[in-house]
């Protein structure tokens, strides 16, 4: 049985509905039957691979975090803007663009829709990628797209300095 929790949530308005109770019972039963956690380990490995694929594609460095759940990855564009180009470039970004510009442009260029992290109590200029539901190749496209966007903004900034 496959059930998308978002679809289940859309099917009711409040409280635990029968589909949710059934789904939770099936998940709990499956967890009890899989004593060696084979499925769980396989899914954790898949998420881990997607996380590293995303970050390797950006060219940015993924810092170790023992508390990382791995379901989402947040990339703070201002951190990487500062690291690669300095504080003046960060100020240029803040003055000339909005935090949502990056995710809109990413959607236009890659046809992949991500959310900015500001709505999830993350840094305003961060991009939030779910690691749970896309193919490995999609994370390559996302990572390369994020890096390309940052570098194209830097190119515009450098051109503005020459004027």
Give, region by region, the residue ranges found by the protein language model.
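PLP-dependent class I/II
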Residues: 1-163
């Amino acid at each position: 049985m496959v059930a998308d929790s978002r679809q289940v949530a859309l099917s009711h308005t409040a409280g635990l509905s029968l589909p949710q109770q059934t789904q939770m019972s099936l998940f709990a039963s499956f967890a009890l039957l899989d004593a060696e956690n084979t499925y769980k380990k396989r899914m954790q490995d898949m998420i881990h691979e997607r996380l590293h694929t995303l970050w390797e594609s950006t060219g940015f460095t993924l810092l170790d975090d023992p508390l990382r759940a791995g379901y989402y990855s947040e990339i703070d564009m201002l951190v990487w803007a500062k690291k690669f180009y300095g504080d003046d470039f960060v100020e240029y970004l803040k003055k000339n663009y909005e935090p949502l510009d990056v995710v809109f442009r990413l959607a236009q260029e890659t046809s992949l829709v991500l959310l900015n992290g500001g709505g999830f109590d993350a840094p305003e200029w961060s991009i939030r990628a779910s690691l749970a539901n896309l193919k490995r190749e999609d994370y390559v496209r996302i990572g390369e797209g994020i890096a390309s966007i940052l570098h194209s903004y830097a190119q515009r900034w450098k051109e503005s300095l020459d004027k």
